[in-house]
Regions:
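A conserved structural motif in NAD(P)-dependent oxidoreductases
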Residues: 205-216
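Active-site helix of classical SDR
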Residues: 113, 154-157, 162
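Short C-terminal tail/terminal secondary-structure segment
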Residues: 203, 221, 232-247
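Residue(s) in the substrate-gating loop at a strand-loop-helix junction
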Residues: 138
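Substrate-binding pocket helix/loop in short-chain dehydrogenase/reductase
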Residues: 87-90, 94-99, 201
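Conserved glycine-rich cofactor-binding loop
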Residues: 10-11
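Alpha-helical segment proximal to the catalytic Tyr-Lys
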Residues: 118, 167-171, 229
């Protein structure tokens, strides 16, 4: 069985990704901040590591436990991410909020990818591939939102992480891609549901509905399944057509 690591696995997009891989007969090691295992009924094929992505020790422990539990790592899905605790105008954004968001979303993603990549490079090559890495970015990587500037900057950083590792790891047969979710029904967007309901009703999206975590999980699995071995450094917009920027 193939083995995938998924950060931010306890809810929303991360939990949907866990389910998608389990249904396709992968074993999964997941990390999240919750003390409670989100999938206690799947102990033979799911291993949970409680930890904080911004912590160097927790990242290393996550990879170590994954490797000792299920062996070689075939895929990494970087889902873990946070929004600012409070939306503030760009002119009022604090260093504390910036540091918190960047430490998890960007720094954590960068150094977890680095840690896993070193393991993947040692994998035997099969059909030209040693492993797959998929980052979860956001439409905020290229869309200005001045009430949560730290989040936009962090996700733009994730997009560059994708490009950098795609370039660096191509010689080893490790494609690195990202999925850019649009307006997805998760805990993160629940606080602004009315705002986005009105925008969608007003024609913001060609596909006029909220996205679901399963929409993202389907795209992630496609990129990690081996079905697209000649694709790397690609950003896949799963956003109902938001990126079309219609007039």
């Amino acid at each position: 069985m193939k083995h995938v690591l998924i950060s931010g696995c306890t809810r929303g997009i991360g939990a949907a990704c866990v389910k998608k891989f389990l249904l396709n007969e992968w074993v999964v090691t997941g990390m999240g901040r919750s003390e409670e295992n989100p999938f206690p009924d799947y102990s033979s094929i799911f291993h949970y590591v409680q930890g904080d992505l911004s912590s160097t020790e927790d990242r290393k422990r996550f990879v170590m436990e994954a490797f000792y539990k299920f062996g070689k790592i075939d895929a990494l899905v970087n889902v873990a991410g946070v929004a600012p605790l409070e939306r503030k105008d760009l002119l009022e954004m604090t260093e504390e909020s910036y540091d918190r968001v960047m430490d998890i979303n960007t720094k954590g993603t960068l150094f977890l990818t680095q840690e896993v990549a070193k393991k993947m490079i040692e994998n035997p090559i099969q059909n030209g591939i040693r492993g797959h890495i998929c980052n979860i970015s956001s439409l905020s990587a290229y869309t200005s939102s001045t009430s949560r500037g730290e989040y936009c900057i962090s996700k733009a950083g994730v997009s560059m992480i994708t490009k950098l590792f795609a370039d660096r790891l191509a010689e080893y047969g490790i494609p690195v891609n990202e999925v850019r979710p649009g307006i997805i029904a998760t805990d993160m967007t629940s606080k602004v549901k009315e705002k986005y309901d009105n925008l969608i009703d007003g024609g913001l999206l060609p596909i006029a509905r909220w996205g679901e975590p399963d929409d993202i999980a389907d795209a992630v699995y496609a990129l990690c399944s081996g079905a697209l071995p000649y694709v790397t450094g690609q950003s896949l917009d799963v956003d109902g057509g938001f990126h079309l920027r219609r007039l």
